């Protein structure tokens, strides 16, 4: 059996190959989503499922106070950084997969629905040494709600709620 750190894969093609290998090898494959282990996140989902805020119309998630790969204090030149997988899109780098994936899994869990569509954008504002984005945002349409997700390696969140934040007909969490 295998536990994979989030996200499962870089592409649908890669995810299907993992699923195929799992079936052939008769091994379970599970994705670990560290945010789902947080007590506050689990309580929020419990309260939403119990109807505390009523019918949910909006879900929002922004990654917490983090500068992504710069959070760990490495001192590297731009050339060295450009060679790191974090900054190479083809290797799975970038803030979309690094942080927006948390909001995606949490909004699916909280809302209990499958998305109908998504609009997104990504940009590289400050990490010019690589081709992966350092900012991404998604607006996801569900049958009865919308989800707004943001993943960034550029902006410090201090004082700004990162989420999840849920708005419903009776109030917000």
Please describe what each predicted stretch is.
Residues 27-28, 35-129:
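Predominantly a Rossmann-like dinucleotide-binding segment in NAD(P)-dependent oxidoreductases
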């Amino acid at each position: 059996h295998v536990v994979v750190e989030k996200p499962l894969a870089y592409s649908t093609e890669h995810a299907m190959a993992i699923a195929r290998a799992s079936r052939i090898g008769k091994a379970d494959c599970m994705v670990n989503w560290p945010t789902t282990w947080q007590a506050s996140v689990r309580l929020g989902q419990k309260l939403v499922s119990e109807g505390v805020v009523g019918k949910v119309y909006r879900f929002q998630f922004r990654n917490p106070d983090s500068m992504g790969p710069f959070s760990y204090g490495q001192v590297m030149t731009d050339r060295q950084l450009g060679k790191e997988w974090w900054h190479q899109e083809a290797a799975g780098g970038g803030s979309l997969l690094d942080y927006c994936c948390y909001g995606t899994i949490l909004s699916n869990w909280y809302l209990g629905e499958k998305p109908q569509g998504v609009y997104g954008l990504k940009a590289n504002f400050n990490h010019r040494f690589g081709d992966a984005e350092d900012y991404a945002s998604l607006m996801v349409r569900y049958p009865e709600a919308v989800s707004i997700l943001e993943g960034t390696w550029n902006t410090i969140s201090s004082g700004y709620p990162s989420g999840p934040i849920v708005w419903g007909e009776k109030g917000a969490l």
